[in-house]
Amino acid sequence: LFVITPLAKLGGEEMDISQISKQLSPAPKRFPDCCLAISSTLISYLASLLPKKPAFTLSIGSGSGLLEGLIVHYDQNVSVEGVEVDSTINRYIAEEDMNVVGGGWGLWSAAQQAAAWMFVYPRDPKLITKYIDTHGDTVDFIVWLGPRVDWSDYEPRFSQSPFSELSFPDQIGLTPYETVVVARRAT
């Protein structure tokens, strides 16, 4: 068994996911290769929310994979796979858990196998609708993380879909200008 720990350039020194996780505190902190400010509170919350193995979460637009890598490092019973348009962007998700699609509108065909989806700072609300319409039949819930100011552009994509039961957890270690929304199927 080989464990490959990706490295990141942070503050002039090389750091792996273990070293980065030790820098986390309850207060959100910015990292150069993640749009979302990250805190130990947020990682703990997401690890408790996301499904446990053998189920997995698909992070659509995972970027460097820092958030996803920190979640898996925190709780190894959680599996998070990434989807991105370019595999070279990824630095923290294990290669076998990284999936590449052709372009910003590309859908990963096995997305319906995931128990949950996570969108972190997504660029286009229409991509969420496209995923829901194409692969949303078997997904249990969707987590949206991004700027509060952007939520109004995304809210209709959820409220007009099967995932219209929305919750807005607070006190989970985000900055005041960021939010998380958990979208579940309406009952």
Give names to the regions the model predicted.
Residues 52-53, 76, 112-114, 138, ...:
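Residue-level preference for short coil/turn positions at secondary-structure junctions
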Residues 63-65, 87-88, 123-125, 148-150:
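Short, solvent-exposed loop/turn segments at secondary-structure junctions
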Residues 56-58, 116, 141:
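Structural motif
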Residues 56-108:
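SAM cofactor-binding core of SAM-dependent methyltransferases
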Residues 124-186:
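C-terminal substrate-binding/active-site "lid" region of AdoMet-derived donor-dependent transferases
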Residues 114-127:
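A short SAM/SAH-binding and catalytic strip from SAM-dependent methyltransferases
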Residues 1-52:
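S-adenosyl-L-methionine
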Residues 48, 101-113, 132-133:
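Short amphipathic alpha-helix with an adjacent loop that forms part of the alpha/beta core around
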